[in-house]
Amino acid sequence: MTERKVYVLGRGGHDYSDAERFGKLVFLDIPNYARWDIDRLYRELEEGLADADKDDLFIVSHLASHCCVCTAILIEWFGRVNFLIYRKDKYEEHKLVVNPDVEA
């Protein structure tokens, strides 16, 4: 089995080191021109997530609009999204299955 990827929106000022126990961190850096343009944001994230797999994870952080678009893309492609949520000084994995019939 290949190592899972952990997608992170932006680099922020957070310490993501605990998330490394779940897989390789992949930073999705959004250019300033796409930051507030949802259509461009969608295209940037589609490109950044091109190598995503159904078992990869997404850290919930950054702007809410960016998290929403990233979640929508992953659900569209895989029927689910695997979140990493920071709670009690560590990351926890949470899976949201919306359409179990989608196969990747």
Model-derived features: positions:
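Elongated alpha-helical scaffolds
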Residues: 62-69
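Long, low-complexity, Lys/Arg-enriched
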Residues: 1-57, 69-104
